[in-house]
Design a protein with these regions (language model features):
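Amphipathic alpha-helical coiled-coil/heptad-repeat segments
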Residues: 1-12, 16, 32, 36-253, ...
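N-terminal glycine-rich anion-binding loops that anchor highly charged ligand groups
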Residues: 23-24
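Short loop/turn microsegments at loop-to-beta-strand junctions
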Residues: 129, 262-263
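A glycine-biased, small/acidic residue-tolerant capping/turn segment at secondary-structure junctions
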Residues: 253-262
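Extended, low-aromatic, Leu/Ala- and acidic/polar-enriched alpha-helical coiled-coil segments
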Residues: 259, 266, 270-273
Length: 292
């Protein structure tokens, strides 16, 4: 039945057009943002999970950054200890050479003095972010971030206290530079021509061996900490990638699917507009019934 008061066909076509426009707006939003769930109203449960996981991922990345700082501290100290071992071994070689009757003792002493200066230079240069583990009392300790744990309240970093004084090359002077009266190399720094005399070479070699033992132990400690930090950093990176991937599966839009849906909805919109136009024109047909 055709009525001049109510155009049911037009009402139906208009409702269809509204639905198509609503779906089209949603799809266009997904295509432009890349998100299937961009706001809580899209899916409150998934949006809440994604928001929490993004926050956790930020904390994991912050922990990874802290691990990077810790790794840098350890690497600087490790490099310093390793260089010191090389220099002390060179001093050891010079001392052993004194057993040769053809060796010029004065030249050996000149070389040893240069090596002593090199040890001081290594100690003074081994600083990162204001911390120098190569200078300090035998009881000196330093804290370094070595890992992190995830708890119900979030992500917390874990630290390890390193007794750096057990392998510190020298004590720390009032001016912040090496004080050669302390540290594992203090006795080597105190070598004089007397220490290189034939009667004292054996004692001096024992001093060198003691220092090498302390430095080797220090290198082992630093190496194990460095390895642990590397493993934790690798885990943090993998965990961050896994979280990001999980969030993506929850809220990201399938662009191929959305693109296909967009094309279909645009076609539906055109058809709905035509349908509404046809429905509206039906009232004009009633007028033709009254024309002579």
């Amino acid at each position: 039945m055709t009525s001049i008061n109510t155009n049911t066909a037009a009402m139906s076509a208009l409702q269809t057009l509204r639905n198509v426009n609503s779906n089209l707006e949603t799809t266009q939003g997904r295509v432009s943002s890349g998100y299937r769930i961009a706001e809580a109203k899209d899916n409150a449960a998934y949006w809440s999970i994604a928001t929490t996981m993004r926050s956790d991922n930020g904390a994991v990345n912050a922990a990874a950054d802290a691990l990077g700082v810790g790794a840098a501290k350890v690497d600087v100290a490790y490099a310093a200890v390793e260089s010191a071992i090389d220099v002390v071994n060179e001093i050891k070689t010079k001392l052993v050479s004194l057993n040769e009757s053809t060796v010029d003792d004065d030249k050996v002493w000149d070389e040893v003095k240069q090596l002593q200066s090199q040890l001081v230079s290594i100690a003074n240069s081994a600083s990162f972010n204001g911390e120098n583990w190569m200078l300090g009392a035998t009881t000196a300790t330093n804290s370094v971030v070595t890992g992190f744990v995830r708890t119900s309240s979030g992500v917390q970093v874990t630290t390890e206290t390193v007794t750096s004084g057990s392998f510190a090359l020298f004590a720390k002077g009032a001016n912040g530079l090496a004080d050669t009266t302390g540290g594992v190399l203090k006795d080597i720094a105190a070598f004089t021509t007397v220490s290189l005399a034939s009667s004292a070479v054996a004692t001096s070699l024992n001093t060198v061996e003691t220092a090498l033992k302390a430095l080797t132990t220090g290198r082992s400690i630093l190496g194990s900490i460095s390895k642990r930090i590397d493993l934790q950093t690798d885990f943090a990176n993998k965990l961050s990638d896994a979280i990001e991937s999980g969030v993506s599966k929850l809220v990201d839009a399938d662009m191929e699917e959305e693109s296909a849906r967009l094309s279909a909805l645009q076609t539906q919109q055109q058809l709905a507009v035509q349908s509404l136009s046809i429905a509206n024109s039906s009232s004009q047909n009633i007028l033709s019934l009254f024309r002579g």
